[in-house]
Amino acid sequence: MKNKFLICDECQAVNLKSLKRKLEKLDPEAEIEIGCQSYCGPGRRKTFAFVNNRPLAALTEEELMEKVTKQLKKPRDPEEEERLRKRNEERKRRKEEQDRKLKEKLKKHKAEK
């Protein structure tokens, strides 16, 4: 089973270019998905990546890469990964819904002025 990395292109603490390069070097065969991961709270203070749907975060990229390396050495449980994938998708869906409602509210507020 191929490894999968999810990394954010919007969070302040994530350096997309260097993190992507390091992950590609660690596992050239892995699938890398770039985009908002709806992990904004931790992403303001820590660099992070989702490794096979499991969130890993650290204060520095070096620390994160150590955690990623350890995670990749652990045996994988397909059922657990599926559960985590569903949880991540639900988190993203809720964030998109919140963003949509906020945009509607702002639009309505501007129309009232």
UniProtKB/Swiss-Prot annotation:
InterPro entries attached to this UniProt entry: DUF1450, UPF0741
Domain of life of the organism encoding this protein: Bacteria
UniProtKB keywords: Coiled coil
Coiled coil: 78-113
Comp. bias (Basic residues): 103-113
Region (Disordered): 68-113
Start-end of Basic and acidic residues biased regions: 68-102
Keyword tRNA processing: no
Similarity-based family: Belongs to the UPF0741 family.
Name of the protein: UPF0741 protein SERP0241
